[in-house]
Amino acid sequence: MMSLSNKSIRNALEMKDENIIFTEDSKFMLVNGIKSLVYFAMLTKQIDRCLNCGLAGHLVKNGFNKNMIVAPSLSLRPTYISLKRQKYKCKSCNSIFVAKTSYVWEYCQIAQPVRQMILSETAFNTSLKDIGRRFNVSDKTVQRIIDEEAKMHKKSLPEHLPKHMAFDEFMSTDKMS
């Protein structure tokens, strides 16, 4: 029997980042007391310069950071990616940072396709709890995702009205109260 390739798994999880490599076969495991499908992956990148001081040639690999990422589910079973991100240390300024990917925002544990699916569900008359249950996140997380998206699209409004305003039509009533 042939196992799935990295490309097949990447397509199923809607992953475009080629720097994420699947390291072993997926397994069914208990995550937060629920039997879940877990994929195992590693993220490494060739980084030339320190993100803090900008010096080249002073970076050393410094182990991995392991996270459980909520991934798109192909069934009703929760799906996660156990992602090991490469850590780097700058010998010049002693700063430590982790490899980044567009698949998951920095300091976030939810994959971008899941965030997009959550946002698309909000267009329908569905409660936050139901959306959270469907995508294996809390209702508070759903609300936070909605708020973050709204903040990105919020246009800055002026604090004062303009000095001159024009009206096409104006209707007045005789009642003054």
For the regions a protein language model found, what residue spans apply to each?
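Short, conserved DNA-binding cores of transcription-related domains
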Residues: 1-101
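Short glycine/proline-enriched turns and hinge-like loops at secondary-structure junctions
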Residues: 33-34, 175-177
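Short, positively charged, Gly/Tyr-enriched micro-motifs
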Residues: 68-176
